[in-house]
């Protein structure tokens, strides 16, 4: 069997197995007696001419096929992602490294351009690249981000900041007031309080900042920043609860109520990567 044929056989097998899991719940002797429910889309809008109004980009930070399979088997053979009809693969190499990082990959998603590892919203020559929220604002769309990482984490920062190095936390926070975000939620309020007084002041000029969901404050605000305490964005194993789904719903409701044109929302599950680093 030659190498080329082996490669084609592998790709065929991969897609065959994925399509099988997308159509049927995997059977087996599972130990988890309390699985999370999964969602099966209706696919009613497939192949229709109706224009897309809202776009939600969901990023599992550091997630690959091993994580999807592990999650599926740990959840009695079912996940929402494996209920989808199609899958795709991308090359993740950055402009200067074979192995990318969250800054370069986040920038690739937010701008459509490859860059060097560590760069946020900038190219290899440290020139600013417009991100999706900035581009979409010119067409009347509003944008938001939700993450279980800190706000200055590389993935969320790639959607609003322009800095040459991901470790420039103070500068990343200082970019927030001039961003095109209408909603953001990330960790944490404690981190926000550590920023320079002038940066806090500028952020509060642009955003209503809340530590807990507050209907009155939410209703009155023009732009909203939900910065919960650090424990709210911790690992699920550390009793995070339903923070991510409930905050995602909050973001959808908030953005929907403030734009008739539509919105873009990036949602990141950051703890996949953090757990994989320790595995």
Place the predicted regions along the sequence by residue.
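Bacterial N-terminal signal peptides
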Residues: 9-17
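The substrate-binding groove and active-site-proximal loops of carbohydrate-active enzymes
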Residues: 120, 235-240
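Active-site His/acidic residue clusters
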Residues: 154-159, 231-235, 259-262, 266-279
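N-terminal catalytic scaffold of extracellular/periplasmic and nuclease hydrolases
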Residues: 23-193, 201-216, 223
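Active-site regions of oxyanion-processing enzymes, predominantly non-cytosolic
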Residues: 212, 217-227, 247-270
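Phosphate/oxyanion-binding active-site loops and adjacent basic polyanion-contact surfaces
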Residues: 165, 240-248
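Sec/Tat signal peptide C-region and signal peptidase I cleavage site
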Residues: 18-22
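Bacterial N-terminal signal peptides that target proteins for export
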Residues: 1-9
